[in-house]
A protein has these predicted regions:
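Structural motif
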Residues: 53, 94-98, 139-141, 191-195, ...
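PDZ/PDZ-like domain segments forming the peptide/carboxylate-binding groove
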Residues: 484-544, 740-741
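Hydrophobic beta-strand positions that form the internal "hydrophobic ladder"
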Residues: 44, 85, 128-131, 179-182, ...
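Cleft-lining beta-strand/loop regions that shape enzyme active-site pockets
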Residues: 511-521, 535, 540-730, 769-773, ...
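Residue-level detector of Asp-centered blade-edge/turn motifs that repeat once per structural unit
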Residues: 39-40, 80-81, 126-127, 177-178, ...
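Extended, small/polar residue-biased N-terminal targeting/export presequences
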Residues: 446-503, 570-596, 781-782, 786-807
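Multi-bladed beta-propeller domains
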Residues: 2-30, 56-74, 89-90, 98-120, ...
């Protein structure tokens, strides 16, 4: 009040229908996150949008077993007798094991009561008395269903980075046919995966691999006489075309381990007079017998070619396995769920055949008769005897649930809070009272009217950790702006106000080393020159009355006719055809790199080379070789890590740059060569700035640690914690929980929230940059030129072939 000086709080209320918060019936067939199958293969289990459904092979209704929009129900597993379904649910506030009747008529029963933690991967024992599972502590357990007693089996002390949380150890376990043993793999102190067999009666686990290789995905044969497993022990090197280096792919084969010391081999010698081998593979209901002494020596290789095998399962006739025939399972390849092909190896014929292609996952029924598979957005069931099947997709048109958004938003918020609690690398959450933070931001949830509001609240919550790589995104967002593509010609323009016409001020070209990036106006025969006028697009006259880009709406990727002239009039103009880009980002990037390269080349009389790293993953892996090999004989190199978006460890690039000559070869008719052949004998500097982060932080750090030269620029972003994978939320959103952090060789925490401080600080002036001036690049050139003047790069040469005898 301007007269009294009093302040009064205004109560503002904006009426809204809150359409995103309304309960509604939705189909979730495009949100499937897990599958399973009934014991006789008549129905599939489908996990979608946090609900558990059973779907008939052909006839009958779809049952929604859980009907819990406010809970995330997951990892369903059908009991061997077909009467119950086990699954995990966070209905209580933590993920607990529940069981429910297979038609959902009765209320579910919660079997566990944990205080906290994330659990995954449920598997029933064949006799139906126990359920094995794994938690975030990398511990394998089994639950006695009757007594509800939980027994720990084993704990993994090591893990690989960058694997999904549901594939963290110990997840590849399998039961013996008599339910008395569990086989699984875990990483040992040797940093290789080994197979262990745990005896429930002895409460003891034994390493049965005792090998030097990666052994994993074990499965018992149905007669209980052998253990089949995958092992990465086939090393057929692929050599690089440019240098002496080896890469090993397709390293996996499948092996059998005979469990009894007097047992028959899995692949005995064939003899027409011998008993039909198939008779020896019938299911044996008696107890499995294992002679652990010498078991690691009773291993044989199955007659299959090396590949990328995973996820074994068996019935009486076949071994089933997935193989990723294109690409690989390399943990350094960030991809979505891979597409794999299902094969079967027949025990009798000792040959394999394809079953179905391009699936994400599969499961074999308890009786071995049927297979459920997940392929794209479809789920299907086919007989296990199928060969090269096109599949049998189930009818998911009625895979529907009652969605109550506000209840789901509460679940999403609570799960995001729990995931940080359970997977954040520092158990004390950097001193943040995490319970208090949950309560603080939960008060905002009732005010949320959209999924975007929920994302914002979670972002504020995880922001309290003051840690990089904490992201939340995606989800069931309804309000999405429609985008209209705008074609881009790869040029800068100016408006000739007098003529009211646009002219080309700068035309972006593609340098020889980047022909894979298209420059629309730089194709042979176009001959468009800077300063010429753009008069028409598809016969529509282009004038300054409209924004230039309005003429290119909807034309990205389309062939367009351009009328061009060196005068602002149609007389004498020529028509050319071009294909505009959707984005000029890549084209402008390579032009910036090429300008820098040429500038360094010109200012150093060709003695200094230039290499830019846009990231520490595929971008650099693609561009690095294009200008690395051609600059091997430079006397200086500028390693530009500015604006580096990160990815993985950049050492793969730096080790090449840091390879020095150890000796030399001389030849009669050509110049001498270095040993190794690909070496760098040059003075180097590394440029960096505040826009370089994650792997972009690591690049200047490792460059300096390796003693490769000084770092120039400004302090980096300071984000060097890691995330193994994005954590899925119930509605398709994603969350990250940083689960590892860097420290140096003295045990000091480094870089995170600090960045890498350069040896020589040089600010980047944006105005100068826009005018083509780059103080950091200039400083790098100056330093290397000065270094070359004081310490010239020389080749030693060799002594004469025949020494002068009088020289002594």
């Amino acid at each position: 009040d301007t007269r009294s000086g009093d302040n009064q709080k205004l109560n503002i209320h904006i009426g809204s229908d809150s359409p995103e918060a309304r309960p509604r019936l939705i189909n979730v067939k495009d949100q499937i996150t897990g599958i399973g199958i009934s014991p006789k293969g008549k129905r599939a289990l489908v996990e979608a949008r946090g609900e558990i459904f059973t779907v008939p092979y052909e006839h009958g209704p779809i049952y929604n077993l859980t009907k819990s929009s406010g809970a995330h129900d997951k990892d369903p597993a059908w009991s061997p007798n077909g009467k119950k379904v086990a699954y995990l649910s966070d209905e209580s506030g933590e993920y607990e094991i529940h069981i429910i009747d297979s038609k959902g008529k009765e209320k579910s029963v919660q079997l566990t009561d944990h205080e906290n933690g994330y659990r995954h991967t449920l598997r029933w024992s064949p006799d139906g008395s126990k359920i094995a599972f794994t938690d975030q502590n990398l511990t394998l357990y089994f639950l006695d269903v009757a007594s509800e007693k939980i027994t720990p089996v084993d704990k993994a002390e090591y893990e690989s980075v960058d694997v999904p949380i549901d594939e963290k150890p110990i997840y590849d376990f399998s039961w013996s046919p008599d339910s008395r043993y569990l086989a699984y793999s875990k990483m040992t102190e040797k940093q290789v995966f080994q197979i262990f067999i745990y005896s429930l009666e002895e409460d003891k686990a034994r390493n049965v691999s005792q090998s030097l290789f990666y052994d994993f995905h074990p499965v018992f044969t149905r007669d209980g006489r052998h253990l089949l497993f995958v092992s990465n022990r086939t090393f057929n090197p692929t050599f690089g075309d440019f240098e002496w280096e080896m890469v090993y792919k397709d390293v996996a084969k499948i092996y059998s381990m005979t469990l009894q010391k007097d047992g028959k081999p899995f692949m005995p010698f064939r003899n027409d007079e011998a008993t039909d081998n198939n008779e020896n593979r019938q299911t044996d209901e008696s107890q499995v017998k294992i002679d652990f002494e010498g078991i690691s020596g009773r291993v044989e290789e199955l007659p299959l070619p090396a590949g990328n095998y995973r996820y074994l399962s068996v019935n009486d006739q076949n071994l089933f396995y997935l193989n990723k025939e294109e690409g690989d399972f390399n943990r350094f390849e960030f991809r979505e769920v891979p597409s794999m092909n299902l094969h079967a190896f027949n025990f009798e014929s000792r040959s394999s055949h394809p079953v179905i292609s391009s699936i994400h996952e599969y499961e074999l029924s308890q009786d071995g008769s049927s297979i459920v598979y997940h392929q794209g957005e479809s789920v299907g069931i086919l007989p296990s005897s199928a060969r090269e099947s096109k599949g049998h997709s189930l009818d998911l048109s009625n895979l529907e649930m009652e969605l109550e958004p506000r209840k789901e938003w509460q679940q999403i918020y609570q799960e995001a809070w729990r995931m940080e609690r359970d997977y954040y690398y520092e158990p004390d959450m950097h001193g943040v009272d995490w319970d208090q933070m949950r309560e603080k931001y939960a008060k905002l949830l009732p005010k949320a009217t959209s999924r975007e509001d929920v994302r914002y609240i979670i972002g504020e919550l995880i922001g309290e950790l003051n840690t990089s790589h904490t992201y939340v995104f995606g989800g069931d967002r309804k309000r999405r702006a429609e985008s209209v593509n705008v074609g881009m010609l790869g040029a800068d323009y100016t408006l000739d106000e007098k003529a009211n016409r646009y002219r080309f001020e700068k035309i972006l070209r593609h340098p020889a080393w980047a022909r894979g990036v298209m420059a629309p106006l730089d194709r042979p025969g176009m001959n468009i020159r800077e300063g010429e006028y753009l008069l028409a697009v598809n016969d529509e006259s282009v004038t300054g009355e409209q924004n230039l880009y309005s003429y290119f709406q909807g034309l990205a990727g389309e062939q367009v006719r351009l009328l061009v002239n060196n005068e602002p009039t149609p007389e004498g103009a020529r028509e050319i055809t071009a294909e505009p880009l959707r984005s000029e980002r890549s084209l402008r990037y390579i032009n910036w790199v090429e300008r820098n390269r040429q500038k360094v080349e010109n200012l150093s009389d060709g003695k200094i080379g230039y290499i830019h790293f846009p990231d520490t993953y595929m971008g650099s892996a693609t561009f690095f070789p294009k200008y690395f090999y051609s600059q091997l004989r430079k006397e200086g190199l500028i390693i530009d890590g500015r604006f580096n978006g990160g990815g993985l460890d950049p050492y793969i690039f730096l080790q090449r740059l840091n390879t020095k000559p150890l000796a030399y070869w001389t030849r009669r008719y050509s110049h001498d060569q270095t040993i190794p052949s690909t070496t760098v004998n040059a003075h180097m500097v590394c440029l960096t700035n505040k826009y370089a982060g994650s792997g972009g932080d690591m690049l200047p750090f490792e460059f300096r640690e390796l003693g490769m030269g000084p770092v120039i620029g400004t302090r980096t972003w300071g984000g060097l914690v890691g995330v193994s994978q994005y954590i899925p939320l119930v509605d398709g959103g994603m969350l990250t929980a940083p689960d590892y952090r860097i420290y140096d060789q003295q045990g000091n925490w480094i870089i995170e929230n600090e960045g890498v401080t350069p040896d020589i600080r040089v600010e980047l002036n944006s105005l100068e940059m826009s005018n083509g001036k780059d103080a950091q690049l200039r400083k790098g050139i100056e330093m290397i030129r000065e270094k070359l003047q004081n310490e010239p790069i020389t080749w030693p040469g060799h002594k004469p072939f025949l020494e002068d005898p009088q020289a002594n």
